[in-house]
Amino acid sequence: MSCSKAYGERYVASVQGSAPSPRKKSTRGFYFAKLYYEAKEYDLAKKYICTYINVREMDPRAHRFLGLLYELEENTEKAVECYRRSVELNPTQKDLVLKIAELLCKNDVTDGRAEYWVERAAKLFPGSPAIYKLKEQLLDCEGEDGWNKLFDLIQSELYVRPDDVHVNIRLVELYRSTKRLKDAVARCHEAERNIALRSSLEWNSCVVQTLKEYLESLQCLESDKSDWRATNTDLLLAYANLMLLTLSTRDVQESRELLESFDSALQSAKSSLGGNDELSATFLEMKGHFYMHAGSLLLKMGQHGNNVQWRALSELAALCYLIAFQVPRPKIKLIKGEAGQNLLEMMACDRLSQSGHMLLNLSRGKQDFLKVVVETFANKSGQSALYDALFSSQSPKDTSFLGSDDIGNIDVQEPELEDLARYDVGAIRAHNGSLQHLTWLGLQWNSLPALPGIRKWLKQLFHHLPQETSRLETNAPESICILDLEVFLLGVVYTSHLQLKEKCNSHHSSYQPLCLPLPVCKQLCTERQKSWWDAVCTLIHRKAVPGNSAKLRLLVQHEINTLRAQEKHGLQPALLVHWAKCLQKMGSGLNSFYDQREYIGRSVHYWKKVLPLLKIIKKKNSIPEPIDPLFKHFHSVDIQASEIVEYEEDAHVTFAILDAVNGNIEDAMTAFESIKSVVSYWNLALIFHRKAEDIANDALSPEEQEECKNYLRKTRGYLIKILDDSDSNLSVVKKLPVPLESVKEMLKSVMQELENYSEGGPLYKNGSLRNADSEIKHSTPSPTKYSLSPSKSYKYSPKTPPRWAEDQNSLLKMIRQEVKAIKEEMQELKLNSSKSASHHRWPTENYGPDSVPDGYQGSQTFHGAPLTVATTGPSVYYSQSPAYNSQYLLRPAANVTPTKGSSNTEFKSTKEGFSIPVSADGFKFGISEPGNQEKKSEKPLENDTGLQAQDISGRKKGRGVIFGQTSSTFTFADVAKSTSGEGFQFGKKDLNFKGFSGAGEKLFSSQYGKMANKANTSGDFEKDDDAYKTEDSDDIHFEPVVQMPEKVELVTGEEGEKVLYSQGVKLFRFDAEVSQWKERGLGNLKILKNEVNGKVRMLMQREQVLKVCANHWITTTMNLKPLSGSDRAWMWSASDFSDGDAKLERLAAKFKTPELAEEFKQKFEECQRLLLDIPLQTPHKLVDTGRAAKLIQRAEEMKSGLKDFKTFLTNDQTKVAEEENKGSGTGAAGASDTTIKPNAENTGPTLEWDNYDLREDALDDSVSSSSVHASPLASSPVRKNLFHFDESTTGSNFSFKSALSLSKSPAKLNQSGTSVGTDEESDVTQEEERDGQYFEPVVPLPDLVEVSSGEENEQVVFSHRAEFYRYDKDVGQWKERGIGDIKILQNYDNKHVRILMRRDQVLKLCANHRITPDMSLQNMKGTERVWVWTACDFADGERKVEHLAVRFKLQDVADSFKKIFDEAKTAQEKDSLITPHVSRSSTPRESPCGKIAVAVLEETTRERTDVIQGDDVADAASEVEVSSTSETTTKAVVSPPKFVFGSESVKRIFSSEKSKPFAFGNSSATGSLFGFSFNAPLKSNNSETSSVAQSGSESKVEPKKCELSKNSDIEQSSDSKVKNLSASFPTEESSINYTFKTPEKEPPLWYAEFTKEELVQKLSSTTKSADHLNGLLREIEATNAVLMEQIKLLKSEIRRLERNQEQEVSAANVEHLKNVLLQFIFLKPGSERERLLPVINTMLQLSLEEKGKLAAVAQGEE
């Protein structure tokens, strides 16, 4: 409030007249003094304040006010004295201490008092810039003596505020004043990385002056040339930056002088150029910047000058921009350091962007403008004119860079729009997201035919911002997205363009550019728009000043409503229409289905907002305009009533396009047909042509062909309509989303297709359809096929779900190629099976590696020799726990090196290849067959077919490479060189592998005649060998004797997740039992974001041991709280999964510094904001006609048939080879693969909790697939020695490795130590061993130690993964013992049954006790998957009565456990064996063998009768039945089993009858176990066990040697889809034929009758259940304890919520009270204050005395 002197005198007189006493008058003096102070009557004010001080001398306010009056009179001494007295009376006045220090330093720095008050103020304001300036003044007065202290002061200040321009300049000046120029230059160079300093004109001026001084000093010394060149480089960069800032902020004269100085620097550097170095690259770039700034200066001169000749200036400016644009981009590799490279790259993009846009701007509307400029000014006279226009005529031209530069070689080259778009993206980074720069770029693109790439610009600035939000109705700042910012920029550019047009219409020359260069043009956006943009950038990049973020959030929140057109947005309808059209056009040009849906969806949003406004305009009503809108209204673009119909039509077209994008094709067609316009015709043509293409791709019937022709006719009709409308009205061409040429081209193509149909063209062959799989060609959608620009089309997918929309084309292509390749391979197999005279050809060093196409993998002929192209998966050496990621079982991509001559596809999965086992006859020792040595191949091998044929025939005749001959040397090193991996392998050579080039040279000799093909040379091998030779060690090369295993790619469980945060912390867990924090461990705390579903979780593992300490989701309801007593720790509560199950935990993380703790909190809250914006969208329903599924099914059937056919051929030929080699062969094994494809409806395991997928594999033993093209894959074979010669010379050893450990977790180690997995596509390589000479290995391997587990001589009747608990009586609650496989084991001898469970990994016993008849299982209350019982347990070594509980994941598994448990009690009484859980039943399943494979097999097989020897007959008669049924209504087909020798078994399997159970070989009762024979061979002590486990979706058997054991674990799966195969393989020296028969009838596997005594004992055991009543009571008590604990937690949570609510209410009351008190203070004494008295009395609960005082204050008496 201001008043005059007269008012003050009247008021003083009235108050003094009513005052009862002089003292009362004096007490009013303070108020009188304030009145005169406002009236600027300082003398009268001093008079009254002095009278007041005489009465109230202890009032600090009066002394402060008097000091202010003295300060205004510049009486510093008296002012300081008054301020000092006020501080003495009230020491809390911190600002007054700083004021005294400033006054003393200003008056006399040498005064000793100044230093005292400065130090006192420094303690009150640490880190204040004002304190620094005061200390700097004090040290400056000391001269040279204070330089060291001043240097320390500046350094400490820089540590706190590195961006402060004044401090940085002061440091450089201090260096310069002390002649430390090198340090000054180093400081300038270091500070160049700071963006805040680079944007300061004062700093850049300081840098230029410093570098110039340093260069002068270097020239005097002439010591270091490299230092001089580096400094010159920095000087040129500083000049360019200073020139840009000067043009923006200074006048024309200063800019001209600086440009002349820049010219001198370039001329000086030009004389020192030489070679390709950093200075040369920088000089070339600075030359471009020099000419660009020269052009900008010319236009700035026209902007500020009078009577300007715009034509002359614009032509000279165009010359400068042409030169700048044609300067090539610098060679970035010449620049040292990544920062320098990035800087120069950004500067180059900025130069090319600005110069290119200005060239287009200046030449717009002028024909051959650039050509005229080049012809006129690109010569000496034009150079002189340019020099005279820029510089003063006094300076000589020859000594300047501009006057001596050669400009005669420039071309007339207009910038390409694609290049400009790319340069713009790079320039965005150079300007750090400046709204002025973005608006300027948008204005340049606004006048061009193409759309600006605003989306790409914003992606450069805001990497992690989502593109669209699902919460358009909200205005929360956390929901801001890329589309909001893009809409904002479109609005700013739109309004700025209209404003420029209005200015240009008033006074504008034809040669004056519409938009001046960026450094010269005025501000293009309003202050409101700029402040909003800056606030958004500050919040997103987390650069808000503490305490200012709330204000920024309010600012952003207010304008988001406007951008999203919510509530009273006040937007002009024309702007809304502009937004809708631009977004629809941009969305149609994007390639991603999701991007199109979001852009066109936002366009529809704005159309819906503008349609009601159009109705208002149609009624000729006015639309209110806000007073201060975010986007200014321009009446020049107001929508007229005549335009409304057109806009409504555009809106409905956009609605229909969105329907098409979302897959609602029928709705889109209906909408388009209702709109009669060329746009709707074009979209209808696209839709019908797409339908025709879909049918043509799968056309199999005449009805579909006719439908395809109808669609093509409709397409033709709509295209003809477009052409007719365009001929009659040329204006409709502008509405077309594509050029007219695209319409004509598409019409021509459609006519050609119709002509082909009518004349029996490509789709017909001899009156019938061509083979769909071999001849069909996949057509791309017409939008991309016929549109000249990708921006003219949109994508939609009417037949597939959204997630397949983008991958459908590539998926179908891959399937067609697979089908074609499979058919060719089947035909080749038919041809090759009839050949028997081909020779086996072993690869030698002259055999080229490129004769086999990609995807073909040779067989492993030696034990454990893996293929070099095999995938890298888990093995026994590197086993990774799969507990945290279900992707563990997926196989990595095959590491195949493509070479020329390979197949057409760039990538073929390993499932397309197949391997053929090589018989052991192909590799023999010491057996000479001269006939084989004399033959040679007449034709070189050209492809894999020939190689395969020779391999098969060679094995059939029993011919192979022979060692032991002496005519020529044949070493293993040669073999290693000639093959492409370890061992002998057919496949591609890995050029990076040099493993066995020198191992075992001249160990064996061999004679091989003329088998090598002279046409195939080994040039590639020689090149590879030369690459590893060195000058000093050509003759010496050492190879390891035993190769290390290949490194396996470890699976951490964090695949597919992005690390948002990682920091080393110490984690604690609150133990409620002892009410204290317990340390969990040290490690890195990570915040991971799932890229698929957007969920965020927190994960921490201990150092070294990597045990999981924390693993839980981050939710929006979680709250971080500081740990009391520490500013470096945060605590929170979460449902943690680190121990396996969800468990509510209170966790705390302690950081090293408070800064790290604060950073964690910010990142945590940022993740919660990310979670708030996850779109809750459900995928669209699958609208599929089934064509893709049929094609996939057809391909899978063919592949399955191919594998069965190959297996049959391989086994048959192997058998023939064995019969012909009577003396040397033993039983060999073929290979087959049983593959059962999962149904399309088959889904993965159902989880109990939503959050349980963190440990999905931990308790899941079923592996299934829900995708047509995804299947679980197996791990790599176990790597062994290259040559395995440690087998016995007699006998045939067969070994098996389980394909999937069904009783344990996926991908765990089985008993033999091998890593197991599943693979339903890969072929199984069967290893074979033959009799021959025995060779001692060079380095013998250690003997295999048999691990004794204590479970020998026991059968596993039940095994499944579960969680085990023990009831703790002391604390009255259940405690977890561990997670692992719980087993029920029965001893073969005494039939005792026990429960055994070990923990995962550590294998510590959790349970080990007998099952007695008096034990009973009881369900725990609240869940039926938990069983509770009481037993005498020996897990800890001693007998102890325990109350135990086990929890299963699935209900059926829990029921199975109960059933087996009950059977175990009775089995012990009867002294009988229990039927294992795995052999109970088999689920009916589909045949894995395709019909095509059956047909091929029936055509190529022939019946063969084998003679069964006597022993075999006896054994075959006693085969044990194995349950394996297949219930099908049609012809049942089962893939042939392993080791099928002869056609009888095949005939049985492929008969029309229902499949019957079958067994393998000898199955005598003695020694057989669960259908598996373990009889010892006649002449050998070694035998091998085998167990084959087959799940419902996969079945695989792999060969693996193992030791003899008395029992074998029977693997099982949760869905009980298991087969048990019984086999017995007697080994003799003579050749033995094996035949597997299918018995017609077999007795049951287990049969037992109950005797009378057993029944009595069983009845008596039921009477003993009363003994367990106490146990049940204790369990009930334990359950109650758990419930009470949960109730306690709920109560504490309720109390916490109530406290939070009370705190919120209290905070609101305090805020209200503060507002009331402020209002009370500023109101005049009287009735207005009295009105607030009741409110204040009520809220403060004042006493009567206090109320009286407050009333007096309200009246103005006190």
Curated annotation (Swiss-Prot):
Coiled coil: 176-229, 805-837
Composition skew (Polar residues), residue ranges: 1236-1245, 1581-1594
Annotated Acidic residues bias: 1318-1330
Positions with biased composition (Low complexity): 779-798
GO cellular component, one term: nuclear pore
UniProt keyword list: Coiled coil, Phosphoprotein, Repeat, TPR repeat
TPR repeats: 60-93, 584-617
Segments forming domain GRIP: 1703-1753
Region (Disordered): 761-805, 1216-1248, 1307-1335, 1581-1622
Entry-linked Pfam families: GRIP, Rab_bind, Ran_BP1, TPR_8
Domain RanBD1: 1037-1173, 1334-1470
Basic and acidic residues bias spans: 1595-1618
Phosphoserine, modified sites: 21
Keyword Coiled coil: yes
Key word Repeat present: yes
Membrane spanning residue stretches: none
Gene Ontology process terms (BP): NLS-bearing protein import into nucleus
PANTHER family: E3 SUMO-PROTEIN LIGASE RANBP2-RELATED (PTHR23138:SF175), RAN BINDING PROTEIN (PTHR23138)
Other observations noted: One of the 8 copies of RANBP2 clustered close to the chromosome 2 centromere.
The protein, known as: RanBP2-like and GRIP domain-containing protein 3
Organism name: Homo sapiens (Human)
Lineage of producing organism: Eukaryota, Metazoa, Chordata, Craniata, Vertebrata
